[in-house]
Amino acid sequence: MIETITHGAEWFIGLFQKGGEVFTGMVTGILPLLISLLVIMNALINFIGQHRIERFAQRCAGNPVSRYLLLPCIGTFVFCNPMTLSLGRFMPEKYKPSYYAAASYSCHSMNGLFPHINPGELFVYLGIASGLTTLNLPLGPLAVSYLLVGLVTNFFRGWVTDLTTAIFEKKMGIQLEQKVHLAGATS
């Protein structure tokens, strides 16, 4: 009986110890990275000028290829996951859901060639790569295929989300903004 209670108590405190390890890992790992990326992104926005970024986003928003292919790729390569998603704030309301759909997937599809983008989910690519390595097959074609299929998929995710957003706009009787309007922005 004492052994069962002791084992239960050790398990219970072990739960909190493991939680502490995870928290410490986040405090020393992902949180400083995210804070640094936020600082750099905001510094770049201030350096370049918010109005210029808004105009660039507005131009990208006018074209589905740039909206769901170009901007997510550049944002993902430069700002990594999850900061690329925050670039959506420069999109008009009408395209924010679609941008998110395309950009969130680009964080996965670019991982094979650029592992810095999403190191937390690199295990998906590495799992497939380990099978090829076991078979003594090259990894280059896998990484390139992963990227190219991902780019096409990113575009279609954004485009299909555009269509579903239009359906919901019509059903709900609303019209989402097609221009960028940020608080405190000088247009």
Swiss-Prot record:
GO biological process entries: phosphoenolpyruvate-dependent sugar phosphotransferase system; sorbitol transmembrane transport
Membrane side Cytoplasmic: residue ranges: 50-67, 153-187
Localization terms from the record: Cell inner membrane
Regions that span the bilayer: 29-49, 68-88, 132-152
Residue spans, topological domain Periplasmic: 1-28, 89-131
Superkingdom of this protein's organism: Bacteria
Induction, per UniProt: Regulated by an unusual system which consists of the activator GutM and the repressor GutR in addition to the cAMP-CRP complex.
Role, per record: The phosphoenolpyruvate-dependent sugar phosphotransferase system (PTS), a major carbohydrate active transport system, catalyzes the phosphorylation of incoming sugar substrates concomitant with their translocation across the cell membrane. The enzyme II complex composed of SrlA, SrlB and SrlE is involved in glucitol/sorbitol transport. It can also use D-mannitol.
Domain comment quoted from the record: The EIIC domain forms the PTS system translocation channel and contains the specific substrate-binding site.
Protein name: PTS system glucitol/sorbitol-specific EIIC component
Species this chain originates from: Escherichia coli (strain K12)
